């Protein structure tokens, strides 16, 4: 889909026809849909809505009022909000993902190409604080333009190379910056790679839940 959106939007709609019908009876307060996670590559602002429109129509056939979130180009980063347009649907909500500074949150992450950020980046500098001021200003600008508060669908820091205390500090800083703007925040992930919960011992990682 990301490499050739036009060739795959019918397949995407067919998948959502099945998924939406299967979950149609689930309460909306417990289940929202996201048509496609983190559009990137050739899946961008120029074709985003046209690509998603058939899938959204398929969802609405069985879930007429189900909340649906849509993220923008370039992995739905915060800067994608500036060019994100939404369909005319009162139950569609904008989302963005927040992993800034990427050099901290993804240090040593082997799936990052051409190479992952170097190890040893520490969070909490004056530059990091200024980054939050700059990025929350982007949210205010989006709300001023659209009247809608976006949903932070992902945030977190890779646990393999970042001490837990630093992950707690980062998580708290992001929450304290964005939550006062009314931004709902979803942490990635529950138990893997960027975890909040230790499934092996059956408990929350110290400090993460409170952050």
List each language-model region with its residue ranges.
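Short, hinge-like loop/turn segments at secondary-structure boundaries
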Residues: 12, 85-88, 111-113, 169-171, ...
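Hydrophobic, Leu/Ile/Phe/Ala-enriched alpha-helical segments that form helix-helix packing faces
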Residues: 23, 59, 139-143, 174, ...
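Residue-level preference for long, well-ordered alpha-helices that form the structural scaffold
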Residues: 4-12, 44, 48, 124, ...
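Active-site mouth of glycoside hydrolases
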Residues: 1-67, 72-80, 91, 194
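A cross-domain feature marking catalytic cores of carbohydrate-active enzymes
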Residues: 35-37, 70-72, 96-98, 153-155, ...
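Glycoside hydrolase catalytic-domain groove-lining segments
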Residues: 75, 79-158, 179, 183
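Alpha-helical packing segments of well-folded alpha/beta enzyme cores
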Residues: 15, 19, 51, 55, ...
């Amino acid at each position: 889909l990301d490499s050739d959106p036009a060739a795959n939007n019918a397949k995407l709609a067919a998948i959502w026809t099945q998924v939406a019908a299967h979950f149609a009876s689930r309460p909306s307060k417990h289940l929202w849909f996201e048509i496609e996670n983190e559009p990137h590559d050739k899946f961008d602002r120029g074709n985003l809505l046209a690509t998603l429109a058939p899938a959204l129509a398929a969802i609405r056939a069985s879930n007429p009022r189900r909340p649906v979130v849509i993220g923008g180009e370039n992995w739905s980063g915060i800067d994608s909000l500036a060019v994100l347009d939404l369909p005319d649907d009162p139950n569609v909500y904008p989302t963005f993902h927040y992993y800034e500074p990427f050099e901290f949150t993804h240090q040593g992450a082997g799936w990052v190409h051409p190479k992952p950020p170097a190890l040893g980046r520490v969070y909490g500098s004056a530059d990091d604080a200024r980054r939050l001021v700059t990025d929350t200003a982007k949210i205010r600008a989006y709300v001023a333009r659209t009247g809608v508060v976006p949903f932070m669908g992902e945030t977190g820091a890779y646990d393999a190379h970042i001490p837990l205390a630093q992950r707690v500090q980062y998580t708290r800083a992001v929450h304290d910056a964005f939550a006062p703007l009314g931004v709902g925040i979803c942490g990635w992930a529950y138990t893997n790679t960027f975890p909040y919960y230790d499934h092996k011992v059956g408990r929350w990682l110290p400090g993460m839940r409170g952050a």
